[in-house]
Amino acid sequence: SAATYPVNPSPANPSMTHTLNYGLLNFAASASKKVSNDQINATLSKTVQNKSSSEVANQIATTLNQAVAIAKKYPQVQVSTGNQATYPQYDKNQKIIGWTGTASLNLKSTDTVAASKLIAELQSFMTLDGLDFSVSDAARKATEQELMIEASKNFQRQAQTLLPVWGAKGYQLVSLDFSQGGDYRAPRAYGSVMMLEAASAKVADQNFQAGDSTITVTANGTVQLVK
């Protein structure tokens, strides 16, 4: 993802209010930091089949209502409904012989223990489709704020380094913007790999390998050389 924060400072020297048409340098400087993944993300789903489309819809609704009711015991976990779909089943003569319905539930939390307990309960009637780890929004934003300062300092140092090469005694900042990037999410681990068994009491105590993500902020700007 990227965000732009334009910086258009007033000229430090009143005599430099002329048109910017020469002595311009455009370059970038970055700052990166490795951050621990502090958020667990999981997706569970339910698939039902029935000859009646209304019965399929009823079973899906019952499943989601049951899941949401259980999730209320874990306020530390944010729960949202995902994709839902109902589609017909056909025989060889293209005649509808039944219906299939699917629905998914998305979970995310910075409380790994609470999330794993909830996942264990939900797995008694839903399937764990996937689980991964990422940097939470709060941690990411805090880190990006730190890196904006560091990237700015790196930009200033780079500008100073370039002055002698161009025979300049100083520079004036013309514009500057920041972009954020990086690998925020650890590789996805699917249910068959994670093996979060619903009946196992060890689920809540499982030591997850959340891993790290690297966050990078780049300062890209233009300066005018002062001779």
Residue ranges and their predicted role:
Residues 1-227:
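Short, charge-dense linear interaction motifs
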